[in-house]
């Protein structure tokens, strides 16, 4: 697995942000999908695993809490 969650990360920058003139509020659902993917990645591979597409586990946990997301959301 070379870059877990790359599809979700690219959807944010490559499509959503460009389409909405970099207004991240309009991309909330796509950003949530990335965070959920990253949460699953860390759950499956351990918190010492890394992906250039995912924030570090401690930051991811904070972001998910701020957005009221749980790892089982989809």
UniProtKB/Swiss-Prot annotation:
Residue ranges annotated as motif Cx10C motif: 5-16
Disulfide bond positions: 5-37, 16-27
Pfam family, one: CMC4
InterPro entries: CMC4, Cys_alpha_HP_mot_SF
Residue window of motif Cx9C motif: 27-37
Keyword Ubl conjugation: no
Compartments where found: Mitochondrion intermembrane space
Domain CHCH as annotated: residue spans: 2-45
Domain of life: Eukaryota
Keyword Oxidoreductase: no
A GO cellular component entry from the record: mitochondrial intermembrane space
Keywords: Disulfide bond, Mitochondrion, Repeat
Main location: mitochondrion
Family under the similarity heading: Belongs to the CMC4 family.
Record note on domains: The twin Cx9C motifs are involved in the recognition by the mitochondrial disulfide relay system.
Protein name: Cx9C motif-containing protein 4, mitochondrial
Organism: Saccharomyces cerevisiae (strain JAY291)
Gene that encodes the chain: CMC4
């Amino acid at each position: 697995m070379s870059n877990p969650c790359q599809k979700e990360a690219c959807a944010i920058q490559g499509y959503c942000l460009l389409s909405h003139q970099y207004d991240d509020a309009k991309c909330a659902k796509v950003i949530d999908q990335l965070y959920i993917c990253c949460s699953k990645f860390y759950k499956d591979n351990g918190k010492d695993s890394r992906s250039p597409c995912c924030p570090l586990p401690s930051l991811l946990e904070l972001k998910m809490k701020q957005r009221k997301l749980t790892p089982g959301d989809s």
